[in-house]
Structures are given as structure tokens and as C-alpha cells.
């Protein structure tokens, strides 16, 4: 399939209610169907595919002007703004260090803005409807994500084993104050060599990757009735000011607005990162 062929799960744009809100989180992918809010321009560390759920979506990528479609692709770490005349949208996150960008189909590899992919849009809405109908009886595993939405596994990126070890450490515990120096020592590289190799293998600086994974870990908490200051400390922010600033940079919304819009959001997935389970 991959943004192209028709699907037996195809569904049209339709009205949604709070019962349709869910988020499936895996270590390397996210499927979100829920409230959009009114996000300002922001930068996410994942490739994001926005899909129309109730109405067409409007996207402004890198201040290139507003464009409208059923599907938009935004590459990792590219500033953008998204809007919709309805309340609900779908967003799929693909963590870029897990895929070989050069081997992705053209519109995924090079798309940066709206694309013409009505069959894919209808298929994603069909997958969403199936998850809603199945409720808690739908047994989903991380390895099911790509085949469900794209028809096959996306091509994996080959990462230097030393950098892969660091990536795994950060993903397992994004709240840990792991410095570049510590990680360099862990994999027996000099500090400068580690920073160079990390950027060459992952595509972004170490600090940018760590910042995104910490902000991403917030997704595991958003439907909980928790004190935001406590959440900030749990996921590794030194104080509420840093927390609010980082989350607004990553999502275009204040933390309190994200939590307010997620009260009726159903989360499915593998649970919290290690640190949050302690």
C-alpha cells in the first residue's frame, strides 16, 4: 500500500465524538486520533503524517504558506503548523532513526507538505474505525504498526552498533540525565568522535534527539489526572518553566492544554518507559 493503492478498510471523512479518540504508542511509532487544538508553529523529532478525519487539514510547512489536503507529510525537525476546520485529526509518527529514508517510497522520503493520497487517507480512517470497533479486544503489537497502515514493514536503517546502544538507552529511559560525555564513555569513543558519529548515523545532533525523546515520553501521561509539576520532574525536566517551553516547541501547545484535550483519550500500547514505571 504505502500511500497508494486502495484498501478494503477504506472509510470516508465523517463526524467524530469523544468515543473515537485513541492513541497507540510503540517505541518507534505513534498513531493518534483525537483533538487537534490550536497549535502554534512547532518542531517534532518524528516524521509526521497528518490525515483528515472529520474535515480537510491545512498545513503550513517552514513558513511556505498554507495548503489544504486529506494528507500531509512533514519531515523530522521541520517547523510547521497544522489546522483543521473540524476538531479531530489523525497523526502518525515515524521515528526517523528507525527507517532508511532513502529507501522509503518517494512521497514519504521527500514529501514536505500536502500530498495527494486519498486512498491512503481512506485506509487510515478504516484502520482507526476497526480499532474503535474492536475496543480492548484488539490485540496490537509494535510489529503490527507498519503492516496495518502501510501494507508492509518500512525499510529499517542500519545503525552503528555503538550508536544503537545509546539510542536504546535513551528510549528506555528518556528522563535520565544522560550526557553526551557519559554516552561517549559508555561506547568507548572520544567525546568529539561520539558527537560526530551520532549525527552521521541518526541525522540530528545528540542533544536534539534526547530533547525530542523526552518530549515524546509525555504522551504516556496525557490522559492521567496528574499534577503537571510532578509529571515534569518524572520525565526529566528540572522545573515547570523548562517543561512548558520544551513541550510548546515540540507540540505547539501548552502542557495544560494537551492534558485538557486528552481527558477522554484512550491509550493503547506497551506502557510507560522504564523510568516512569519505577
Annotate each PLM feature.
Residues 31-34, 146-155, 195-203:
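Short, Lys/Arg-enriched N-terminal segment that forms or immediately precedes the first helix
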Residues 177, 181, 200-238, 261-278:
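Terminal helix-turn-helix DNA-binding modules in bacterial transcription factors
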Residues 117-125, 146-178, 184-187, 208-226:
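A short, Lys/Arg-enriched amphipathic alpha-helix from helix-turn-helix/homeodomain DNA-binding modules
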Residues 104-133:
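Aromatic/histidine-rich interaction motifs
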Residues 1-22, 126-131:
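A short, N-terminal "cap"/entry segment at the start of jelly-roll beta-barrel domains
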Residues 16-109:
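N-terminal regulatory/effector-sensing and dimerization cores
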Residues 194, 198, 242-243, 247:
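Short hydrophobic/aromatic patch on the recognition helix
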Residues 190-191, 238-239:
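Short coil turns linking two alpha-helices in DNA-binding domains
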Amino acid at each position: 500500500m504505502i500511500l497508494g493503492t486502495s484498501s478494503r478498510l477504506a472509510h470516508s471523512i465523517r463526524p467524530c465524538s469523544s468515543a473515537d479518540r485513541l492513541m497507540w504508542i510503540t517505541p518507534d511509532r505513534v498513531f493518534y486520533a483525537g483533538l487537534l487544538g490550536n497549535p502554534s508553529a512547532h518542531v517534532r523529532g518524528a516524521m509526521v503524517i497528518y490525515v483528515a478525519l472529520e474535515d480537510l487539514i491545512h498545513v503550513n510547512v517552514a513558513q511556505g504558506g498554507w495548503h489544504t489536503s486529506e494528507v500531509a507529510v512533514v519531515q523530522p525537525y521541520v517547523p510547521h503548523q497544522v489546522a483543521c476546520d473540524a476538531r479531530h485529526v489523525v497523526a502518525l509518527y515515524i521515528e526517523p532513526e528507525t527507517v532508511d529514508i532513502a529507501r522509503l517510497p518517494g512521497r514519504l522520503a521527500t514529501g514536505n507538505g500536502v500530498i495527494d493520497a486519498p486512498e491512503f487517507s481512506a485506509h487510515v480512517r478504516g484502520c482507526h474505525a476497526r480499532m474503535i470497533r474492536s475496543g480492548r479486544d484488539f490485540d496490537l503489537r509494535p510489529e503490527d504498526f507498519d503492516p496495518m497502515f502501510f501494507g508492509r514493514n518500512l525499510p529499517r536503517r542500519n545503525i552503528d552498533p555503538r550508536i544503537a546502544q545509546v539510542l536504546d538507552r535513551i528510549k528506555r529511559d528518556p528522563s535520565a540525565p544522560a550526557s553526551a560525555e557519559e554516552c561517549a564513555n559508555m561506547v568507548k569513543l572520544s567525546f568529539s568522535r561520539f558527537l560526530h558519529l551520532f549525527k552521521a548515523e541518526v541525522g540530528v545532533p545528540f542533544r536534539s534527539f534526547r530533547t525530542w525523546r523526552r518530549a515524546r515520553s509525555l504522551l504516556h501521561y496525557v490522559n492521567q489526572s496528574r499534577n503537571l509539576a510532578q509529571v515534569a520532574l518524572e520525565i526529566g525536566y528540572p522545573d515547570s518553566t523548562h517543561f512548558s517551553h520544551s513541550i510548546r516547541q515540540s507540540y505547539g501547545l501548552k502542557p495544560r492544554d494537551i492534558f485538557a484535550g486528552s481527558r477522554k483519550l484512550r491509550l493503547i500500547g506497551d506502557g510507560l518507559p522504564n523510568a516512569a514505571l519505577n
